């Protein structure tokens, strides 16, 4: 999928940065030196989304990477951001309201405890192994769901381990153009 951010995209990113800086002073959510690079990294996964998802979930959303930025980039998609840490979920709610993101719902809970829904896309950034993530997402996906997992240098070994258990799933590894150093994307389709 090609990313074509609207005119207000840069303004939205600037608003997000201001929200994060304000919240970070009190709650110490992140310590990124180059927030622009992290935003680009979050957006770089869009090129591996082959369809236009209607419903998507971001698991372990933390300070909004990549979930909030994918929601900004895909405004016609309904996004469900799952973050069990109350402080981080409060920030996500604050950012959602500040950015007027009507397409985002914040779930201050673990995904496995949430009300089930079928997502077209499930994203996550370096939260846990692909195998474990797919397992905790049972009830949120079917064989048509795409998993977009932001991984690091161990992606090859992780994909190999995943393929042993999910033999019918299609699992590919990609590198993004604007991703952080060592970023690999694990794209999984057909998990059952």
Regions found by a protein language model. Name each.
Residues 1-53, 57, 87-104:
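Class I SAM-dependent transferase core
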Residues 78, 103-105, 146, 167-172:
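Conserved beta-strand segments of alpha/beta enzyme cores
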Residues 154-192:
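Active-site capping/gating segments
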Residues 127-131:
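Alpha-helical transmembrane segments of helical membrane proteins, especially in multi-pass transport
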Residues 134-146:
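A short glycine-rich, Lys/Arg-flanked "PGG" loop and its adjoining helix->strand segment in the class I
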Residues 144-156:
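Conserved beta-strand signature within the Rossmann-like core of class I S-adenosyl-L-methionine
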Residues 43-124:
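Conserved SAM/SAH cofactor-binding pocket of Class I
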Residues 20, 151, 188:
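Residue-level signal for inorganic ion chemistry
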């Amino acid at each position: 999928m090609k990313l074509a951010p609207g005119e207000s995209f840069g303004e939205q990113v600037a608003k997000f940065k201001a929200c994060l800086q304000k919240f970070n002073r009190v709650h110490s959510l992140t310590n990124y030196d180059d927030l622009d690079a992290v935003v680009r990294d979050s957006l770089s996964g869009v090129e591996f989304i082959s369809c236009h998802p209607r419903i998507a979930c971001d698991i372990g959303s933390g300070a909004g990477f990549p979930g909030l930025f994918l929601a900004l980039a895909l405004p016609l998609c309904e996004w469900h951001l799952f973050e069990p840490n109350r402080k981080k979920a409060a920030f996500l709610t604050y950012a959602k309201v500040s950015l007027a993101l009507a397409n985002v719902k914040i779930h201050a809970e673990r995904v496995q405890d949430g009300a089930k829904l079928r997502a077209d896309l499930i994203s996550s950034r370096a939260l846990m192994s692909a195998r474990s993530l797919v397992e905790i997402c049972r009830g949120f996906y079917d064989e048509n769901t795409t998993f977009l997992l932001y991984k690091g240098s161990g992606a090859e070994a992780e994909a190999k381990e995943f393929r042993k258990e999910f033999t019918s799933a299609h699992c590919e590894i990609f590198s993004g153009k604007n991703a952080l150093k060592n970023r690999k994307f694990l794209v999984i389709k057909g998990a059952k």
